[in-house]
Curated annotation (Swiss-Prot):
Residues 413-425, 843-853, 1122-1136, 1244-1258, 1301-1313 have a biased composition (Polar residues). It comes from Homo sapiens (Human). Regulates G protein-coupled receptor signaling cascades. Inhibits signal transduction by increasing the GTPase activity of G protein alpha subunits, thereby driving them into their inactive GDP-bound form. InterPro entries: GoLoco_motif, PDZ, PDZ_sf, PH-like_dom_sf, PTB/PI_dom, RBD_dom, RGS, RGS10/12/14-like. Residues 1187-1209 form the GoLoco domain. This is Regulator of G-protein signaling 12. It is found in: Nucleus; Cytoplasm; Cell projection, Dendrite; Synapse. There is a cross-link at K196 (Glycyl lysine isopeptide (Lys-Gly) (interchain with G-Cter in SUMO2)). Interacts with GNAI1. Interacts with GNAI2 and GNAI3; the interactions are GDP-dependent.
């Protein structure tokens, strides 16, 4: 080291100026083929064999003077790299062949010392080169570093050390004797070498070395006492910006900014051994031995990265000559942050065995973590050991240390750091800092073979690296020749002899370990007098936390990305007292060295070839020698030319190039056994594939994904190649109501891969695509022009390219319209931000305004995007990617490219499909998520077990236990195991029991979502999800006027009046005419109180006018008597039963539907006539205006949800396309509803008198059959066996409860449609997880219903065992007069106003009978707001604030 002013005092004899020449280098596929180090000027540190740079004759050591006619002789390192990186074609450079190919140090901050006089030159400002520094920093951040061009090279780097061997003398032992302090050069004199006087001055000016020279005798003790050695990854170093000495928080934020910066740049870490000695921290590689050392007195503190706990930083301070902390003129401290990471993926012993062999040590079992001490699972043990070394540095550092420990989670998101040094030196400091800086060396391997014939000076200036475990070691390793080890001070002198020939630009400061030996603190006080040691073995706050086991912000945490790996939990290291004293000691006795060995002997020992570069076998014959090599320290020759960046080349070819294709990766990846150390002798460049980036762990896979989100913005084609990209793009399209585009494209892409000779498969797939996307009655039609429309006859001769034109149209539509909007969407922005910050990609369900809209009805990746695309016709739910019979090889070949075809459906086989067995064909696995297309067929949402689909998501996954995290109401959270075959309710019941929570009075939500989950789903779909459990209020409500009781579950925060009003309105009552009180009390209840006050209570509603209630009850009792005759007359399906129950409105609807009466089945007409007779006898015809008003209400509400693909949301603007319009015969009944309504009821609608008819004999009304809310399961028939819907089994009493009044066909149609819509809408975009899709679902839920005399157990589920949700096709069970409704069956009673009741308690023209019958026995209406209103509700759905939801 030298000061800026020292250069003027020394003679600098040297040869003539180096030869300057101009070269032109063409850019190859992997770049130009060279790496740089140093600055002012930059020097080539490595030239790859066979690269363009090698072809034009560039050699390591050449200086770059100009780039593309821009003088860069005085430019900084990063500016030169930026200039070269911007050049895309031929690179014009002017290079100077320095004497002996001299190479500069690679630190960014050093001035130029390569001109003849060696004066310190000012750095060339970036503006002179036309580079904006801010712009450069931003680009580096965005691109993840400025060396992308370097990483694209798949081959190994190889320096040109062989030609250099011809020019340089081979160093023999006889030649080594000429290396004396008085000699100025070796073979080629170096003009920048230090003189003998300067060496002496430098040594004596350094407080550390002066200690060693003044007190030789005190350092005869063993200096290699090692606390612990751990394998960590080194990312790089950044010099911290100067901060005011009284701003502790600013300093801490700057350090965290450094860690964030290096982490965001995605620099590939280099594995090093971090040896935490008793007085310093050493870094060693598997090739070069000790490459850096951080003395304890320079360790300011260490901190963990707040964003990613795997990363941690060591902060080193600079000290002045007197031992005090170095401060600049303004009083700011000069510090550097060195960033490391602990790779939890290496925790497993089997995984890191190869690394341990490479580093030459044996793993030490750690009983505390059941792992190996050298491979920690987190950064916590490393930081705990390092904290032991802290010295007292004054109040500032102590304050920063305290903040780092106690305030570690405080996020300092601003990045205050300067640009990182691009060549990632372990130290990055100013030239004039002399020996105060940390050693800067290469982390790569040696440039020459370490053998007897190797040259000791391959690449003058320290190109030759000392191999790990080479015989020349300190006083703790036996000398291979039997000579006594060196004394510490002699080692220091020997080291400076060597440094003399390294050149002044080489930053040299390796205080030998012997200078800080295991001297007790008492003796150290005399030994190190004046050196400012004042060692405090444990700072107060560190000691306190160590004793208490408190880890503050570095508490135990999980480092793995999935968050559930149990082995990754950080644990405290064992206390120092429990670690055996000899656990890390080198075995064997250590001879005391002679105190006065001649200097010439030191030199011979230091530089003799046999001593320096002796073969490894000479020192690894015994176990003791192996341990010596493991912890052998050496003096660490500096290798400035080999330092390039933090992305280091190690022994094995393991680096993945991010931009390389999968095929290239397969061919480029080299396994552990394929390369030997000899093959990698010249591998010192980051161009190679060699690193630990793809150690046998999932880390390699993670790196492949690191830039995947950014790659989506490269092109639309690139997006479609990434299954994850397709998934998020599908989510975006679903929000845009155009998901059918990507589904159609995927279907066509899959169709294109069907073999042309497989006519049967082609025909099947072609018809499926045509019927689903292209025909006039398509369920999910795509928007293509008329020229691309296909006629039915083309399906007779299908061929793989038949949909090419249509696919291209949709592709262009997505590419030029949807894709650009996707890149601007909050969903993509959130993804790219998560990738930059190293987080897992967000759940699109939780991204504001970007998740798959709650209006969408399907699951994650192939759902039916809007209600209008549903179909009510009986149709197979076949998906695009179900099994292809025996063509397993075909499936593997095709499925590799498309996320939606990777997981096969577990549907029936092709043979069963052909026989028409479509019951289970509605499962469509797409991108690992499920889609159901019940669409009116017998296949229902509930009849399919989600676990089937989930089992196909990752067939190659191991069977490891899966977990989810549930946040409980008390603020705690717990991890719950999920398993296929067990429903969510099953796993939730056990959790609720353990925590004393009534499972029936709780709802489960996704974190960030507001829809409760459907609890009968398979629990395996909750893997790695964050959920929250919310309590609900359960109470019983007795409706005395109608002799009914209901069990209700309500949101605790709702007022009593808001909960009760919609309930009583549902039963045709008016809350204002009722007296509300608790059972057993006479005082009226406060309707403004929160409903939580009624938890577990029994609330009674009585008529203020008893006579009115009696009359209403008498009317109801008279209804079923007439109905029984009609019900028992013949077997009826759901539609017939519904019509029998619609008395009030049937007559009015009849007039509207007169035109189409003749189209109905004759049998239906007879039924309708019988129903009409009953209606005429019992009721008068209601006002047509009211019916029209109700139709208008339904129409408006539904049109709000029938958002077509053009995005029209209002009925006035909605023009239905042809495929949604009904035939003219049923136009009077037409509602602007989706195709589900049009097609589901066009066959069944009452065109003659407006009433529903029974389905055709072959049709089954599945939604009602599977619903326990079916009329057949009304009170009195709740336990009837399954049969044709609506029939009353022979011998069983007909429904005779007071709620079995006939019902309007309109409400019936709405209810039937609601069943279809509900099933579709429950599958919300949340990874296939079903949620109850209702806007007010969390506010009020009907738990059960029965007579007033019914026991509580039939209305409210017992707290201990939550009520089981009936399966989709299971009939309800109960007793006569009472029944239990499934928990998650939702009936939306949106916004019921408190208008005065009409005749018999009806509301606004709707009869009381229909309203009550629907509430008791009718099927639920849809959870969609558009289907919410029922006949018993007013015509203004959005004018009231009262909401309720019945289950």
């Amino acid at each position: 080291m030298f000061r800026a002013g020292e250069a003027s005092k020394r003679p600098l004899p040297g040869p003539s100026p180096p030869r300057v020449r101009s070269v032109e280098v063409a850019r190859g596929r992997a770049g130009y083929g060279f790496t740089l180090s140093g600055q002012a000027p930059c020097v080539l540190s490595c030239v790859m064999r066979g690269s363009p740079a090698d072809f034009v004759g560039l050699r390591a050591g050449d200086q770059i003077l100009a780039v593309n006619e821009i003088n860069v002789k005085k430019a900084s390192h990063e500016d030169v790299v930026k200039l070269i990186g911007k050049c895309s074609g031929v690179l014009h450079m002017v290079i100077a062949e320095g004497v002996g190919r001299f190479e500069s140090c690679s630190s960014d901050e050093e001035g130029g010392l390569y001109e003849g006089k060696g004066w310190l030159k000012p750095k060339l400002d970036s503006k002179a080169l036309g580079i904006n520094r801010a712009e450069r920093v931003v680009e580096e951040m965005q691109s993840g570093g400025i060396f992308n061009m370097i990483f694209e090279n798949p081959s190994l780097c190889a320096s040109n050390s062989e030609p250099l061997k011809l020019k340089q003398r081979s160093l023999s032992e006889s030649a080594a004797t000429r290396f004396d302090v008085g000699h100025e050069s070796i073979n080629n004199p170096n003009p920048n070498m230090l003189s003998k006087e300067e060496i002496s001055k430098v040594i004596h000016d350094d407080s550390v070395f002066s200690i060693g020279l003044e007190s030789h005798d005190d350092f005869a003790l063993d200096a290699s006492i090692l606390n612990v050695a751990m394998i960590v990854g080194y990312l790089g170093s950044i010099e911290l910006p100067s901060t005011s000495s009284n701003l502790e928080s600013d300093s801490l934020q700057a350090i965290r900014g450094c860690m964030r910066r290096l982490r965001a740049e995605q620099k590939i870490h280099s594995l090093v051994t971090m040896k935490i000695m008793h007085d310093c921290v050493q870094l060693s590689t598997d090739k070069a031995g000790v490459v850096a050392e951080y003395p304890a007195e320079k360790l300011a503190f260490s901190a963990v990265c707040p964003d990613d706990r795997r990363f941690f930083g060591l902060v080193t301070m600079q000290t002045n000559d007197d031992g005090s902390l170095a401060q600049e003129e303004e009083g700011a401290l000069r510090t550097s942050c060195h960033v490391f990471m602990v790779d939890p993926d290496l925790f497993n012993h089997k995984i890191h065995q190869g690394i341990a062999r490479r580093f030459g040590f044996e793993c030490t079992a750690d009983p505390d973590t059941n792992g190996c001490l050298e491979f920690p699972a987190s950064s916590l043990p490393v930081l705990q050991f390092i904290s032991v070394l802290y010295r007292d540095m004054g109040e500032l550092i102590e304050g920063m240390r305290a903040r780092a420990f106690l305030d570690g989670d405080a996020d300092a998101h601003q990045n205050n750091s300067t640009s990182s040094n691009s060549d990632s030196g372990i130290g990055n400091f100013h030239q004039e800092e002399k020996s105060n800086r940390v050693l800067v060396v290469d982390l790569g391997g040696s440039s020459s073979r370490h053998g007897p014939g190797g040259s000791a000076w391959d690449g003058v200036g320290g190109r030759g690296a000392q191999p790990w475990g080479a015989p020349w070691t300190g006083p703790f390793c036996p000398d291979p020749e039997g000579s006594p080890p060196f004394e510490a001070a002699h080692q220091t002198d020997r080291f400076w002899d060597l440094n003399k020939h390294l050149g002044p630009a080489s930053p040299v400061e390796v205080p030998p370990a012997s200078l800080r030996s295991s001297v007790p603190p008492s003796k150290r006080g005399t030994v190190g007098a004046g050196c400012g040691f004042n060692q405090r073995w444990l700072p107060v706050h560190v000691l306190r936390e160590w004793q208490c086991g408190h880890t503050s912000d570095q508490d135990s945490y999980t480092d793995s990305t999935d968050g559930w790996s149990s082995i990754n939990c950080g644990t405290l290291p064992p206390p120092m007292s429990k670690i055996p004293a000899d656990r890390y000691r080198v075995e064997g006795s250590f001879a005391q060295p002679p105190l006065n060995a001649p200097k010439r002997e030191w030199s011979r020992k230091a530089f003799g070839m046999q001593s320096i570069f002796g073969p490894h076998r000479n020192v690894r014959k015994t176990k003791e020698d192996k341990k010596g090599s493991k912890f052998g320290r050496g003096t660490g020759l500096t290798q400035p030319s080999q330092r390039t960046s933090a992305r280091r080349s190690f022994g094995r070819s393991k680096r993945f190039s991010i931009t390389r294709s999968l095929d290239d990766l397969e061919s480029a990846t080299v396994s552990d056994g394929e390369l030997t150390g000899a093959d990698l002798k010249d591998c010192v460049s980051n161009n190679s594939l060699s690193s630990n980036a793809s150690l046998p762990s999932v880390q390699s896979c993670r790196r492949l994904r690191e830039r995947r989100v950014a790659s989506w913005a490269v092109s639309f084609e690139r997006l479609l190649q990434d299954p994850v990209g397709v998934r998020y793009f599908s989510d975006f399209l679903r929000k845009e109501f155009s998901e059918e585009n990507i589904l159609f494209w995927q279907a066509c892409e899959y169709f294109n891969h069907v073999p042309a000779h497989d006519k049967k498969e082609l025909s099947y797939r072609a018809r499926e695509i045509f019927s689903k996307f292209l025909c006039s009655k398509a369920t999910t039609p795509v928007n293509i022009d008329s020229q691309a429309q296909l006629a039915d006859d083309v399906l007779r001769a299908p061929h793989p390219d038949m949909f090419k034109e249509q696919q291209l149209q949709i592709f262009n539509l997505m590419k030029f319209d949807s894709y650009t909007r996707f890149l601007k969407s909050p969903l993509y922005q959130e993804c790219i931000l998560a990738e930059v910050e190293g987080r897992a990609l967000p759940d699109s369900q939780q991204v504001p305004s970007s998740p798959a809209s709650k209006h969408s009805l399907g699951s994650d990746h192939s759902s039916v995007s809007t209600p209008k695309k549903l179909s009510g016709k009986s149709k197979s739910g076949r998906s695009l990617n179900e099994e292809l019979g025996d063509e397993d090889s075909e499936k593997k070949r095709k499925g590799a490219f498309f996320s939606w075809s990777r997981t096969r459906s577990t549907g029936r086989s092709q043979k069963k499909r052909e026989h028409g067995d479509h019951a289970d064909d509605a499962l469509h696995a797409n991108g690992g998520l499920c889609r159901r297309e019940s669409q009116g067929s017998v296949s229902s949402a509930g009849s399919l077990d989600l676990s089937e689909a989930c089992r196909t998501l990752a067939p190659e996954k191991d069977k490891a236990t899966k977990h989810c995290c549930i946040h409980l109401p008390d603020g705690t959270s717990c991890v719950v195991a999920v398993k296929a075959g067990f429903s969510i309710k099953d796993i939730l019941s056990g959790l609720c029991e353990r925590h004393g929570i009534n499972g029936a009075a709780a709802d489960l939500f996704l974190v960030g979502g507001d829809k409760p989950l459907v609890l009968h789903q398979d629990s395996s779909i909750l893997e790695s999800r964050d959920l929250r459990l919310e309590k609900r209020t359960l109470f019983r409500l007795d409706l005395v006027p109608i002799n009914r009781s209901v069990g209700l579950k309500a949101k605790p925060t709702k007022p009593v009046t808001e909960v009760l009003r919609p309930v009583v309105a549902r039963y045709g009552l008016d809350l204002s005419g009722l007296l509300v009180r608790l059972s057993g009390e006479k005082e009226p209840l406060d309707l403004g109180a929160p409903i939580s006050s009624l938890d577990g209570q029994r609330v009674v509603l009585e008529e203020k006018d008893p006579s009115r209630g009696k009359a209403s009850a008498d009317k109801q009792k008279g209804v079923p008597v007439k109905q029984n005759t009609a019900v028992n007359s013949s077997s009826r399906n759901h539609s017939a039963t519904g019509e029998e129950r619609t008395l009030g409105k049937s007559n009015s609807i009849k007039i509207k539907g007169e035109n189409g009466k003749n189209a109905r089945d004759p049998r239906l007409s007879k039924r309708e006539e019988s129903i009409a007779k009953i209606g005429k006898k019992k009721y008068q015809k209601i006002n047509l205006d009211e019916a029209e008003e109700f139709f208008e209400l339904i129409s408006k509400a539904q049109s709000n949800r029938a958002d077509d693909q053009r995005g029209l949301l209002r009925k006035e603007d909605l023009v239905l396309p042809e495929f949604l319009r009904l035939p003219p015969g049923s136009t009077e009944l037409t509602l602007p509803t989706p195709a589900a309504v049009a097609k589901g009821f066009s066959k069944r609608s009452a065109t003659g008198n407006g009433r529903e008819s029974a389905s055709q004999p072959g049709e089954q009304w599945e939604p009602v059959q599977e619903s326990s809310d079916s009329p057949s399961t009304s009170p009195g028939s709740a336990s009837s066996p399954p049969g044709p819907p609506g029939t009353t089994p022979p011998g069983q009493k007909s429904p005779s409860g007071p709620f079995c009044t006939p019902q309007s066909p309109v409400s019936l149609a709405q209810e039937g449609t609601a069943q279809i819509w509900k099933r579709q809408s429950q599958e919300v975009e949340a990874g296939g997880i079903q949620t109850v899709e209702d806007e007010h679902v969390a506010e009020l839920t009907l738990m059960g219903e029965g007579d007033i005399s019914s026991p509580n157990s039939t209305l409210l589920p017992p707290p201990s065992t939550p009520q089981e949700v009936p399966g989709p096709s299971r009939p309800g069970s109960g007793t006569h007069g009472s029944r239990d409704l499934p928990v998650n069956r939702i009936i939306d009673v949106d916004l019921v106003t408190g208008s005065a009741p009409g005749r018999d308690g009806g509301i606004a023209g709707a009869q009381a009978g229909p309203g009550r019958s629907q509430a008791s026995g009718g099927p639920p209406t849809s959870d969609l707001p558009g289907l919410g209103p029922v006949p018993g509700e007013p015509a203004k759905p959005k004018t009231s604030a009262h909401h309720a939801t019945f289950v």
